[in-house]
Regions:
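Glycine-rich, highly charged phosphate/nucleotide-binding loops
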Residues: 41-57, 171-182
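N-terminal beta-loop-helix "entrance" segment that forms/cooperates
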Residues: 26-48, 103-106, 158-164, 291-295
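Generic N-terminal targeting/processing segments that precede catalytic cores or assembly contacts
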Residues: 249-400, 404
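Short, polar loop motifs at secondary-structure junctions
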Residues: 27-35, 94-99, 132-134, 152-156, ...
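A structural signal for small-residue-enriched, beta-sheet-centric alpha/beta enzyme cores
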Residues: 253-256, 406-412, 417-566, 573-583, ...
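Anionic-ligand binding region
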Residues: 131-172
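A C-terminal functional module that forms or caps the active site or interfaces directly
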Residues: 162-169, 173-213, 218-222
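Glycine/small-residue-rich loop that forms an oxyanion/phosphate-binding "nest" at active or ligand-binding sites
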Residues: 57-114
């Protein structure tokens, strides 16, 4: 088992990451303020000292500890360190991103030092953003100079302030919807003090507000961690470290997007030109800022101004057609100041609108273009750069993808919004669906036709012969996501083809019909059957159902169609509620062989 200490944004990252493993784990917080609904989480609350942590780990066979607690939870970090050393359990510290130190900020190693510096600097009115637990630590200052403390609006915080003897009239309350400038403009301090709480703790917002007001800024730096903690940043860093200590924790292995691979090779090629080096491993930032390191397959200097680097795509356990194939980047320094993306072998050409890319340009999506640009401009801020991404096997592999129906011809796309491939992930599917819908809207804004897959699409296309092929998209199990995208893009109307297995689940209100999330509910089927007055024979058949498609075998065609139409009407109510009243939707229920189709409403 794994024990996580959370209660923070990083705690939620740990929950999301570990849930991918499909195994239960313990999640410890001091209080109950953080709401956690993940079914795999076994929640424990209350402060834990070192002996308590040690006993818990022994009793519950803990193999790994993840410290995702607040950076200033110094006592907890120390207790985790003592217990983990005693038991020989490894500790992963999930760290925040911390901005580099700035010259206009006074950094202090302790609250004592901060008080000394602020008194010496002549601070007259201090806005303290360090929390109620620090009122006592700043006592020496607020007993001499005017101080306003911003605290959480809860009784526990008020009790602490009262216990410390801090004047209640000099308290203000934090509200999430209020901008950081607001308290400054109300009380007019000449300085603020805050903790080095990192980007997820709102540190930058506080600093920028103080800068705009021209205030002195004092920051108490985060305390050191036990030296045996293994520090990681971000979800992927945590994923990799958990795999290191518990190799079988995640059933499926993550990989990297084509966009990440292209970014790494482009950076490696430019480094070869600028530094005349052939780096075997290259660091790049993922779109969320997390730093990762990937191994390069080869680097070649083609001329003093041109170099090429390659990487072998690792998609993990995702069924990616490009897994194991080469992705290359050629970088050339040219005249001018522009960074250009040129057409490369095996990368598709955009031929249809809707993808957010110019027609005729290489199919390199916005996020990879951004990450490549950021990495290259960090090394070479000024001057022209031509970047050519290529996939030697791309043209042949593209035939196995949806690229042709997206209007991308001659090769594959360089894609990826997170930089990481999660096998069979919801995120990847919805991202692909969004691209298909974008092209569909560009070519057919009047109607989007959604189907669960190729089988139902083949049947339903006959109903809409006037529509281009791109107007038909697959929703898989994610009906709710597909409808949200349709609403977001303002299609004039929507048609949804569905087979009876998914229809039974959707009719009950389940917008995600995956078998892991919901199964056929016979009690619900009986309820609908009673409402439409079916015979005892139909109820007996429902009792014996193994698969919902067996409903097509109801002996009475009249009863069958009456029951199925009632289910379809319920499906319509569920789906229509996800769209605006001005966006009509029609549903088509398709039999297993495609020979019978029920529609509701019949016309829109």
């Amino acid at each position: 088992m794994i024990l996580v200490f959370g209660g923070t944004t990083e705690g939620r990252i740990a929950i999301d990451t570990l849930s991918e493993g499909g195994k239960p784990f313990y999640y410890s917080t001091r209080g109950e303020q953080q709401k956690v609904e993940e079914p795999l989480v076994q929640r424990i609350t209350g402060a834990m000292d070192a002996p308590t942590i040690e006993e818990f780990c022994r009793t519950h066979e803990i193999r790994l500890i993840i410290d995702a607690a607040h950076p200033f939870a110094q006592e907890l970090h120390r207790n985790i360190g003592v217990a983990s050393l005693s038991l020989g359990i490894p500790v992963i510290r999930l760290e925040r991103n911390y901005p580099p130190h700035a010259q206009d900020i006074t950094y202090c190693s302790s609250y004592e030092e901060a008080v000394d510096r602020m008194l010496a600097d002549g601070v007259r009115h201090l806005l303290a953003l360090t929390g109620t637990q620090t009122i006592g630590k700043l006592r020496r200052f607020w007993q001499q100079r005017k101080t306003t403390f911003r605290i959480l609006s809860r009784q526990e915080s008020l009790d602490i302030a009262c216990k410390e003897g801090f004047p209640e009239q000099q308290l203000i309350f934090y509200t999430p919807e209020e901008e950081e400038d607001a308290p400054i403009s109300r009380i007019h301090p000449d300085a603020i003090i805050t903790k080095e709480s990192g980007e997820s703790g709102g540190f930058l917002e506080k600093i920028e507000a103080a800068r705009r007001a021209g205030l002195r800024i004092y920051v108490v730096v985060r305390p050191p961690l036990p030296p045996h903690f293994h520090l990681v940043e971000g979800q992927h860093g945590l994923y990799r470290m958990v795999r290191r200590y518990i190799p079988d924790y995640f059933p499926l292995k993550r990989g990297y997007t084509t966009g990440t691979c292209a970014t790494v090779t482009a950076k490696a090629a430019l480094m070869a030109l600028l530094y005349e080096s052939e780096e075997q491993e290259v660091e790049v930032a993922l779109p969320d800022g997390e730093i990762i390191t990937l191994s390069i397959e080869s680097i070649e200097r083609l001329s003093p101004t041109k170099a090429r680097a390659t990487i072998r795509k690792d998609a993990g356990d995702d069924p990616d057609v490009i897994h194991g194939h080469i992705i290359a980047a050629t970088v050339e320094l040219v005249a001018g100041d522009e960074l250009r993306f040129l057409q490369g072998e095996g990368v598709g050409v955009v031929t249809l609108p809707g993808l957010g890319l110019p027609i005729g340009s290489p199919a390199i999506n916005a996020t990879p273009r951004s990450t490549i640009t950021q990495e290259l401009r960090a090394l070479y801020p000024e001057g022209g750069i031509d970047v050519t991404i290529s996939i030697p096997d791309g043209a042949a592999l593209a035939a196995k993808t949806f690229n042709p129906r997206l209007g991308i011809v001659g090769g594959l796309s360089i894609i990826g919004t997170s930089g990481i491939v999660k096998p069979f992930s919801h995120e990847a599917f919805v991202d692909s669906l969004r691209k298909e819908c974008s092209v569909a809207f560009a070519l057919s804004p009047s109607r989007l036709v959604m189907n669960s897959g190729a089988k139902s699409e083949a049947y339903i296309k006959a109903l809409y012969p006037q529509l281009p092929p791109q107007a038909f998209v697959h929703y898989g199990n994610f009906i709710g996501d597909a409808l949200s995208i349709a609403q977001e893009m303002h299609f004039a109307s929507v048609s949804l083809g569905i087979m009876v297995g998914k229809a039974v689940k959707l009719a009950e209100g389940n917008l995600d019909t995956h078998s892991k999330k919901v199964v056929m509910n016979k009690d619900f089927l009986h309820k609908v059957a009673y409402e439409v007055g079916t015979s005892s024979d139909t109820h007996a058949l429902i009792d014996e159902l193994t698969m919902a498609r067996e409903l097509w075998g109801i002996p009475s065609i009249q009863e069958r169609d009456c029951l199925l139409l009632a289910l379809l009407q319920r499906c319509h109510s569920v789906t229509a509620s996800q769209l605006s009243p001005n966006t009509p939707i029609v549903l088509h229920l398709i039999s297993e062989g495609g020979e019978t189709i029920l529609s509701y409403p019949e016309k829109i």
